[in-house]
Amino acid sequence: MIDTLFSEVNINTIKEEDIQLNTEQFFINFINQLEGWKTKCKNLHLSAPQMGGDNIHTRLDEYLEILSEFQDSIAEDYQATLGDMNPNAMKGISCDSLNALDFIREVMIKTKEFYNKIPQEIDYVGIKSETETFIHNIFKYKYLFELCDIRPY
C-alpha cells in the first residue's frame, strides 16, 4: 500500500517534470528558429539589390530588427516564467528560402504553428501577446516585401 502510494507520487512528479521539460524545449526550439531566421534575413539583406526608394534591401534590414526584438522579448519572458536558459541553448535552425517572399511565408507558417501551441496557462499570456504583435508585423512586411523588386535565385 505505502509502496503503491509512493510510486504514484513519483509517477505524477515525473509527469510534471516531463511537462516542464517539454514546455521548456518547445520555447527553446522556437527561439532557435528565430535565430535561424535572423541569419537568413541578414543573408537575404546582404545579397539584395540596393536601389533607391522602396527596396528589399532596406525592408529586410527593418525586418531583422523586428525579428531580433521579438526573439529577445520571448527569451526574456521564457526565463521569467521557466527559469534561466542554458548558455548553449541557442543554436539557430537553418532556413533555406532564397528570396524575401518565400522567407516571410515560412516565418508566417511556423509562427502560426507556434502560436497555436502556446500553453493556455496565464503564465504564458505575455508570450502569446508578443506573438500576436509579431504576426501583425509578418503581415505588414509581407505586404511591404511584395511592393519591392525581389531578385529570384
Identify the residue ranges that each predicted region occupies.
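Charge-dense, intrinsically disordered terminal/linker segments
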Residues: 1-25, 126-129
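Helix-loop segments that flank and shape redox-cofactor active sites
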Residues: 36-62, 84, 114-126
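Acidic/histidine-rich alpha-helical segments that form the ligand environment
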Residues: 89-145
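Generic structural signal for well-ordered, non-transmembrane alpha-helical segments
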Residues: 28-35, 39, 61, 65-72, ...
